[in-house]
Curated annotation (Swiss-Prot):
Membrane topology: Multi-pass membrane protein
Subcellular location: Membrane
Site (Role in the control of polyamine-mediated channel gating and in the blocking by intracellular magnesium): 173
Protein function: Inward rectifier potassium channels are characterized by a greater tendency to allow potassium to flow into the cell rather than out of it. Their voltage dependence is regulated by the concentration of extracellular potassium; as external potassium is raised, the voltage range of the channel opening shifts to more positive voltages. The inward rectification is mainly due to the blockage of outward current by internal magnesium. This potassium channel is controlled by G proteins. This receptor plays a crucial role in regulating the heartbeat.
Segments on the Extracellular side according to the record's topology features: 106-129, 149-157
Subunit field text: Associates with KCNJ5/GIRK4 or KCNJ6/GIRK2 or KCNJ9/GIRK3 to form a functional G-protein activated heteromultimer pore-forming unit.
Protein name as catalogued: G protein-activated inward rectifier potassium channel 1
Length: 501
C-alpha cells in the first residue's frame, strides 16, 4: 500500500477530504498547503448523508385517522422514547385496571370487613385492601404463584374475571412484546455499517466520461442479493410551462450488464457512463458551477444473519461531485489475504480530464474528422461524372441496327439501354434478352460475333416463315421461302445487308 501511495503521490496530487464542509485542500509531496477551494453555500437537501429524507407531511386533516388503521406499523415507526413510554404506560394501566376489578369484587362481597372471620370464605383469600388485590393480580399475571392468595370456589364472578384477565394479558403481551421485538430486529442499524464515499467524482474510465462513487461493507457478514440504484433529482420546466420541483430521473449504473448486482465483500466503485442517454449528457465542468441537482443512491440487500431486507441511502449534491478526480486504491495484497485500508476510503486524487461535456466532445470530434465520402470539389470531376452518366445512354449505339430499332420502342425495358462491355454488366442485362440470346452470350469465345450472326438468323427466320405462309402462287413468284433474299432487288439486298453490319 505504501508503494501505491508513493506511486500515485508522485504522479498525481492527492486530495484529502473532510466531512466538516471546510473545503478541499490539495497537498502533494514536498508541497505546502495550496489555495483552499471554498465550497458553495450549503443548500437544502432532499436526502441527508445519513439517508434520512427531509420531508414532513402537513395539513393531513381527517387523513390522520389512517394511522390508527395500521396501529402496529405506527408503533414500530415511532421513536424509541415513545415506544418505551407506550410500553410502560400500557402495562401500568392494565395492571391498575385489573387490580381495581379484584378490589371491587372484594368490596362488593364484603370481603374487606369479614376477611378475619373464622368460618367466612372470601372470593380471594387473604385480600384485605387494594395493595393486596394488586399483589394478587401481579402474582397471577406473572404466574409467580406464591400460594398465599388464591381464588376460592365460592366466587363465580372471580372465576370469570380470572379468565378475562388471562385473555387480556395474552393480547397485551403479544402486541407490545411483538412490537418491541420487531423494532429491535429492524435492519436499520445494519445500514450503519454500510459506507458511502463522501464525494462522487467525474473522470475518464475506459475512454468514456464516467460518474463514480464508492460503497463499502464494514462487516464480515455479506449482503445477499445486494442491488444499487441511483436517482437524479432536478428541477425543470416542461414545454407546457409546468414546473417540476423534484423531477426524478433514473441513472443507469449497469442495469443491462448486471453491474448493479453487487458482490459487496470489499469496497466497490459504482460507475454511471455519461453518454447520449444520460441526464448528464450536456454537463461540463463550467456548467457545474450553475447547475443544481442531487444524486440519490439507494443500496438494498438481504442481511445474511437475519434474512431481513436492509436499505441504505445517501445523496450527492452538485458541490459534492469532484470533476477530474479518481478514488485512491484501498485494496492491497498481503500474505495469504487481501487487506482493505478504510483510512483512504474517501480519498481522491486529480487526473487529467477534459473539462467539456460529452455533447461538446462529440461535436468537436465531428467537426475535426474528415467525411467518409468527400463531395466533388471541382468542375473537372463533375464533368467526368456527367460523361459517365451519358455513356450509359450511348451504349445502345454499339448494338446491331435491328436491336437499335427495337430499343427505340417506349415499352422496351430500360435495362437494355445500359448494357456494358464488362462481364458483370453483361450478366446483369442478359436477364432481359430472349432466351436464345442468353444462351449464345453464355458460350465462351467470340460472343459478340456469334451474337450478331445469331441475331441476323433470328431476324431472318420470321421473314422466311412469313414467305412460307403465302399462297403457292406467291411463293413461286418469290422463289420459295428459302430464297427470298436472292429474289430481292439489288438495292434492297444492299440495304438489308447494311442493317446487320
Amino acid at each position: 500500500m505504501s508503494a501505491l501511495r508513493r506511486k500515485f503521490g508522485d504522479d498525481y496530487q492527492v486530495v484529502t477530504t473532510s466531512s466538516s464542509g471546510s473545503g478541499l485542500q490539495p497537498q502533494g509531496p514536498g508541497q505546502g498547503p495550496q489555495q483552499q477551494l471554498v465550497p458553495k453555500k450549503k443548500r437544502q437537501r432532499f436526502v441527508d448523508k445519513n439517508g434520512r429524507c427531509n420531508v414532513q407531511h402537513g395539513n393531513l386533516g381527517s387523513e390522520t385517522s389512517r394511522y390508527l388503521s395500521d396501529l402496529f406499523t405506527t408503533l414500530v415507526d415511532l421513536k424509541w422514547r415513545w415506544n418505551l413510554f407506550i410500553f410502560i404506560l400500557t402495562y401500568t394501566v392494565a395492571w391498575l385496571f385489573m387490580a381495581s376489578m379484584w378490589w371491587v369484587i372484594a368490596y362488593t362481597r364484603g370481603d374487606l370487613n369479614k376477611a378475619h372471620v373464622g368460618n367466612y370464605t372470601p372470593c380471594v383469600a387473604n385480600v384485605y385492601n387494594f395493595p393486596s388485590a394488586f399483589l394478587f393480580f401481579i402474582e397471577t399475571e406473572a404466574t409467580i404463584g406464591y400460594g398465599y392468595r388464591y381464588i376460592t370456589d365460592k366466587c363465580p364472578e372471580g372465576i370469570i374475571l380470572f379468565l378475562f384477565q388471562s385473555i387480556l394479558g395474552s393480547i397485551v403481551d403479544a402486541f407490545l412484546i411483538g412490537c418491541m421485538f420487531i423494532k429491535m430486529s429492524q435492519p436499520k442499524k445494519r445500514a450503519e455499517t454500510l459506507m458511502f464515499s463522501e464525494h462522487a467524482v467525474i473522470s475518464m474510465r475506459d475512454g468514456k466520461l464516467t460518474l463514480m462513487f464508492r460503497v463499502g461493507n464494514l462487516r464480515n457478514s455479506h449482503m445477499v442479493s445486494a442491488q444499487i440504484r441511483c436517482k437524479l433529482l432536478k428541477s425543470r420546466q416542461t414545454p407546457e410551462g409546468e414546473f417540476l420541483p423534484l423531477d426524478q430521473l433514473e441513472l443507469d449504473v449497469g442495469f443491462s450488464t448486471g453491474a448493479d448486482q453487487l458482490f459487496l465483500v470489499s469496497p466497490l466503485t459504482i460507475c454511471h457512463v455519461i453518454d447520449a442517454k444520460s441526464p448528464f449528457y450536456d454537463l461540463s465542468q463550467r456548467s457545474m458551477q450553475t447547475e443544481q441537482f442531487e444524486v440519490v443512491v439507494i443500496l438494498e440487500g438481504i442481511v445474511e444473519t437475519t434474512g431481513m431486507t436492509c436499505q441504505a441511502r445517501t445523496s450527492y449534491t452538485e458541490d459534492e461531485v469532484l470533476w477530474g478526480h479518481r478514488f485512491f486504491p484501498v485494496i492491497s495484497l498481503e500474505e495469504g489475504f487481501f487487506k482493505v485500508d478504510y483510512s483512504q476510503f474517501h480519498a481522491t486524487f486529480e487526473v487529467p480530464t477534459p473539462p467539456y461535456s460529452v455533447k461538446e466532445q462529440e461535436e468537436m470530434l465531428l467537426m475535426s474528422s474528415p467525411l467518409i465520402a468527400p463531395a466533388i470539389t471541382n468542375s473537372k470531376e463533375r464533368h467526368n461524372s456527367v460523361e459517365c452518366l451519358d455513356g450509359l445512354d450511348d451504349i445502345s449505339t454499339k448494338l446491331p441496327s435491328k436491336l437499335q430499332k427495337i430499343t427505340g420502342r417506349e415499352d422496351f425495358p430500360k435495362k437494355l439501354l445500359r448494357m456494358s462491355s464488362t462481364t458483370s454488366e453483361k450478366a446483369y442485362s442478359l436477364g432481359d434478352l430472349p432466351m436464345k440470346l442468353q444462351r449464345i452470350s453464355s458460350v465462351p469465345g467470340n460472343s459478340e460475333e456469334k451474337l450478331v450472326s445469331k441475331t441476323t438468323k433470328m431476324l431472318s427466320d420470321p421473314m422466311s416463315q412469313s414467305v412460307a405462309d403465302l399462297p403457292p402462287k406467291l411463293q413461286k413468284m418469290a422463289g420459295g421461302p428459302t430464297r427470298m433474299e436472292g429474289n430481292l432487288p439489288a438495292k434492297l439486298r444492299k440495304m438489308n445487308s447494311d442493317r446487320f453490319t
